[in-house]
Amino acid sequence: MKERINQLLQEIGQCVAATVEEAEALRIKYLSKKGEIARLFDDFRLVPSEEKKQIGQMLNELKNKAQEHINSLRERAQAGSAQASAETDLTRTSYPTRLGTRHPISLVKQEICEIFARLGFSIADGPEIEDDWHVFSSMNFAEDHPARDMQDTFFIEHRPDVILRTHTSSVQSRVMEKTQPPIRVICPGRTYRNEAISYRAHCFFHQVEALYVDKDVSFADLRQVLLYFAQEMFGAETKIRLRPSYFPFTEPSAEMDISCNICGGKGCNFCKHTGWVEILGCGMVDPNVLDNCGIDSKKYSGYALGMGIERITNLKYRVKDLRFFSENDLNFLEQFKSVH
């Protein structure tokens, strides 16, 4: 293990990057959750107990030096790019002014909110920089749950109990702490996870979660709301199905699929010839969550559901690459001028 650490430390120290993209490739190779350093941390459990302290210090030092070196490479690459931009001919004729248009994520977010508003849901908002209690503990996440791992969550360096929220469930927690049932809210917002950026994943994305708490709320109520939402969003012919799943904050839990809106449920490459496409997770609110937030779980019940806005936008407008939503490419964004 020591030889592997020293070898990797030397290898990283020799890395160079001429562009920001090359620096990002190095970060993914060495620092992502499936990278070289993560694999060493996985193997740490095999180290003899008498060597764990020394090896642990070496691993932490390796990770810190790798982050410093790759960040330095990124900053130098950015500085070089800025210098090149500064050499642009300032006497050159400017581009004509263009009128802006609404972003596709904003369009879909508004449509989702309008659908739930027709069902009597109000909109709730909360901070993006959150504490551990509202993001994890109140939502019934165990202390050793993988979502708490630094590979998945952005922690504040000097305040490990302060994080960037990984889901908008934290807003549900805050609403339940301050409001007694009946509660009927949706919680749209931006969330963050420590993911390598690719066509199907990003370090930030947008969610809408819904919460309904009252007396005698049942899974049948949830299913009817899901069917209404799917048909309003994707068309009256849309069918839904629910599959058993697991989430810490709901019990029972399910994932919802809709009939593929491209092939009409007949089967195509987009739906992998199943005729179904997954769009959201849902379930009955776990009694522990209600109790954590000061609501009597013996008196009240509720349901919750959550979806990624990017996922819904992908399906609605058939966008195959998540990166398009954050790259500010006018050729892409102007395609939505006619969408209202």
UniProtKB/Swiss-Prot annotation:
Taxonomic source organism: Porphyromonas gingivalis (strain ATCC BAA-308 / W83)
Catalytic activity: tRNA(Phe) + L-phenylalanine + ATP = L-phenylalanyl-tRNA(Phe) + AMP + diphosphate + H(+)
Description of how the protein assembles with itself and partners: Tetramer of two alpha and two beta subunits.
Cofactors demanded by this protein: Mg(2+)
InterPro entries reported in the protein's UniProt record: aa-tRNA-synth_II, aa-tRNA-synth_II/BPL/LPL, Phe-tRNA-synth_IIc_asu, Phe-tRNA_ligase_II_N, Phe_tRNA_ligase_alpha1_bac, Phenylalanyl-tRNA_Synthase, tRNA-bd_arm
Gene name linked to the record: pheS
BP-aspect Gene Ontology terms: phenylalanyl-tRNA aminoacylation
Chain positions recorded as Mg(2+) binding sites: E251
Record Pfam families: Phe_tRNA-synt_N, tRNA-synt_2d
Enzyme class: ligase
Family in the record: Belongs to the class-II aminoacyl-tRNA synthetase family. Phe-tRNA synthetase alpha subunit type 1 subfamily.
Keyword entries, A-Z: Aminoacyl-tRNA synthetase, ATP-binding, Cytoplasm, Ligase, Magnesium, Metal-binding, Nucleotide-binding, Protein biosynthesis
CC annotations in GO: cytoplasm
Name of this chain's protein: Phenylalanine--tRNA ligase alpha subunit
Chief localization: cytoplasm
Localization (cell): Cytoplasm
